[in-house]
Amino acid sequence: MLLQFGGPHKRGANFANPSFTQIHPTCIPPGGIYQSKLTLMSESLRNDGRIWLPKKIDSKDDPENIPEHERDYFLERQYPKYGNLVPRDVASRRAREICEKGFGIGFGGKGVYLDLQDSIKKDGLKVIKAKYGNLLEMYERIVGEDPTKVPMKIYPAPHYTMGGLWVDYNLMSNIDGLFVLGEALSLIHISEPTRQHH
């Protein structure tokens, strides 16, 4: 009961690190001015998808009509060792930066392509659908395009507001005997205690 409805904080537990937000690089970008939020897609898509943009600024060409030599696989180019599997913050920053330079696609130029075609050719459509079936169906329902035929449009969006109860190295709050675990911690998405502040 103590953990519900901000109970620990109301009882004097210190709160820490509320100023950080985790950004998720694979969200469905806005489709119009009336869209109030971006839809989160799974990061697992970057395991099999290649992220790219047209090399031409403000390209209005359909992605399937853009030849390979006119595509910029910017994460693979900038980070050849990691490619599309760079950390979330890096993928998010690079996508935003390149879109701000005018290379973005879709509504307001706020999108990049996540293309599954190479993985479909390599592993087969059946394997890709087995891995991502629910995500592919959700994307098609929202966007109206089959992501196994047309590259997905993605863009970074806020995912997780960090901050929570302050803990010491033993994961105990400033309330004697109150230990804090999981996402109630004043940390990032993982359980790792913060440094004590004196």
Question: Which positions does each model-derived feature cover?
Answer:
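Hydrophobic or amphipathic alpha-helical targeting/insertion segments
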Residues: 4-13
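Catalytic cofactor-binding cores of redox enzymes
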Residues: 10, 22, 195
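Peri-catalytic substrate-binding/gating loops that frame the active-site cleft of hydrolases
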Residues: 1
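An anion/pyrophosphate-binding glycine-rich loop and adjacent beta-alpha core
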Residues: 14-141
